[in-house]
C-alpha cells in the first residue's frame, strides 16, 4: 500500500488498581519516560504523557498496523514491572483492568 497515508491519533487513559494514589510525583517523570519508550519501540510516536497519582493520560500517533489493545497491554505490563522492580511502592503495583481510548 505504497500510496496510503494515515495519521491516527489516540488518547488513552487508564488507572491504578482501585484508583490508589501510587504514582508519586517523585517518580512520575521516570514513569512517563518509560511509557514513551514503549510507545516508540512499537513504532508509534508519543506526543504527550501526563497524569495524576492514580491515573495516566497518553496522547500518541500510532501506526495503522498497530494493535491498540496489545500496545496498551504492553505499556501497562512494562510499567508495572518497572515500578515493582524499582520498589517505588510498598507491595505490588497493579493497574485496573481495561482502559479508555478516544480518537
Tell what function each PLM region has.
Residues 1-103:
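Basic nucleic-acid-binding interfaces
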Amino acid at each position: 500500500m505504497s500510496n496510503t497515508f494515515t495519521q491516527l491519533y489516540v488518547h488513552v487513559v487508564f488507572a491504578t488498581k482501585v484508583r490508589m494514589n501510587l504514582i508519586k510525583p517523585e517518580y512520575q517523570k521516570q514513569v512517563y519516560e518509560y511509557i514513551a519508550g514503549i510507545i516508540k519501540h512499537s513504532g508509534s510516536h508519543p506526543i504527550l504523557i501526563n497524569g495524576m497519582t492514580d491515573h495516566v493520560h497518553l496522547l500518541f500517533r500510532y501506526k495503522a498496523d498497530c494493535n491498540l489493545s496489545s500496545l496498551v497491554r504492553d505499556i501497562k505490563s512494562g510499567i508495572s514491572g518497572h515500578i515493582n522492580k524499582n520498589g517505588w511502592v510498598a507491595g505490588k503495583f497493579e493497574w485496573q483492568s481495561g482502559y479508555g481510548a478516544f480518537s
